[in-house]
Amino acid sequence: MTMKKLLTLVAALAVTSLTAYQASAEQLQSHLYDITKSGMLKVCIWPQYYAISLRNPDTGKLEGIDIDLSEQLAKDLGVKLEYVETSFSTFIADLQASKCDLGMFGVGATMKRAQAVAFTQPYLISGVYAVVQKGGKIKSWADIDKPGVNVGMPLGSYIEPFMRGYLKNAKVVAVAPPATVQAELMSHRVDVMATDFPASTKMNAQFDWSMTLSPPEPMSVTPYAYVMNQGDQIWLNYVNLFVQNIKLDGRLKAAAEKNKLGPIVAP
């Protein structure tokens, strides 16, 4: 073997070794490695989200599609599950502070949020709806964007920036926890609750005075996905595979139908 060939072989081996080392280092830095090593999956949820991740006020237990599916994810991983409470206005900071490994609470995958966090493929899709009180001054979608009308939505939700751009005459009221838009609507501090399919379903099921208004055309149709810190491709690949599997094996459909979310399951 000539010296030139020997040097070429040594260089190739060095590159191969470096690539293997880098891959090993990336694996050790992944949440997937940390989760399997610790035996614990930490999932961020917003416990006020009906049919998604609600803490039932009567039982104190968590329920909803993402409670069911987070249990399935932990089962697939072979680890225990711990919930970390967050909100739409704080979940990005909570993820970046490593308070949880993953957000599973119907997070709208918007372009702006994607600048700060990573999203999986979607599992639900919803547009914007309006919930009002029967017999009130708001009787149709056309009545909403008028002077003197207060439109409420959760602070930090994807609906907030959309409605700020959409409404030209009505007032936007972004409601911060622990207050809820539902309570603001019931107390007449807002006239309209701008919300999504799960929350509108809850209101109609829970209150006989509740009425849902749909826009003339679908509005701000948004994919809902699971969310994590950027830069962890190994963990993102794993959770994407989980989402793909639950679509194929029927677990997503079953969990959605159980929680009355069948109409908004993502294809």
Regions flagged by a language model, labelled:
Residues E26-G106, K258:
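Extracytoplasmic small-molecule ligand-binding "clamshell" domains
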Residues E26-S30, Y158-V175, M211-P215, Q244-P267:
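Ligand-binding clefts/hinges and TM-proximal coupling segments of bilobed small-molecule sensing domains
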Residues S53-T59, S70-V79, I159-A176, N204-D208, ...:
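Ligand-binding cleft/hinge of the Venus flytrap
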Residues I67, E71, K75, K80-D145, ...:
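Acidic, polar ligand-binding/catalytic clefts
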